[in-house]
Curated annotation (Swiss-Prot):
Residues covered by the DRBM domain: 153-223
Cellular localisation: Cytoplasm
Catalytic activity: Endonucleolytic cleavage to 5'-phosphomonoester
Originating organism: Nostoc sp. (strain PCC 7120 / SAG 25.82 / UTEX 2576)
Entry protein name: Ribonuclease 3 1
Residues at the active site: D41, E113
Length: 228
């Protein structure tokens, strides 16, 4: 059995594996895992941030933020959940199982967070015990996957945020060449919504500059705690 599933308190592990849908169908089971999920999410954000801070001393805040998002996004946490054997151990309601819950990335990732939170409590709130489990998982993610995920669709992600929070008006990118050479120009892009500037970025072509501006806009929103 994977070490993450070795608990002193079996009831705590059972609660971490129990989804709300199971409790709805079995009220006598008591508490579901959402409070533990909240705790695990906070722990994973801290440990991933600390791990990246130590392992990438040459990276700036924006890139570290993007890399952390890639390490603890739903897709990656779901993979971790399967790797440690959580998938068919999840306690789901019949409807969730019928809808493919054991393969559902959202359920897998949230259960993984809950088990991390529970493991922390089971080890007397010792963060070192969790670090010993989670850092090898972080290290197992190929660098190329982290890079690709951290840079994927930043313009689309920002546009989706605008549509959800402001309205249908798409972001506008103002791009100009600011220097470089004819064979290696340098461009600067500024992204606006209406008349408000949200971010800016520099790149070797217009596309890269606009992507950097969108990434900067997302980083600014994250600082203001405006991203989900």
């Amino acid at each position: 059995m994977y070490k993450l599933l070795m608990f002193r308190d079996d009831k705590l592990l059972r609660r971490a594996l129990t989804h709300r849908s199971y409790v709805n169908e079995n009220p006598e089971e008591g508490e579901h895992n959402e409070r533990l999920e909240f705790l695990g999410d906070a722990i994973l954000n801290f440990l991933s941030g600390e791990y990246l801070y130590r392992s990438h001393p040459d990276r700036g805040e924006d890139e570290l933020t993007r890399r952390r998002s890639a390490l603890v996004d739903e897709k990656q946490l779901a993979k971790f959940a399967i790797e440690v054997g959580l998938d068919f151990k999840m306690r789901l309601g019949k409807g969730a199982i019928r809808d493919g819950g054991y393969q559902n990335p959202n359920l897998l990732s949230s259960t993984f967070e809950a088990v991390i939170g529970a493991y922390y409590l089971d080890n007397n709130s010792n963060i070192e015990a969790v670090r010993a489990i989670i850092e090898p998982l972080f290290e197992s993610v190929p660098e190329q996957i982290v890079v690709v995920r951290s840079n994927v669709d930043s313009k689309n992600r920002f546009q989706e945020w605008v549509q959800r929070n402001i309205g249908p008006t798409p972001p506008k990118y103002l791009t100009e060449q600011i220097g470089g050479f004819s064979h290696a120009p340098e461009f600067k892009a500024t992204v606006l919504v209406g008349e408000k500037e949200y971010g800016e970025g520099i790149g070797k072509n217009k596309k890269d500059a606009e992507k950097a501006a969108a990434e900067n806009a997302l980083a600014n929103l994250n600082k203001q705690e405006l991203l989900p």
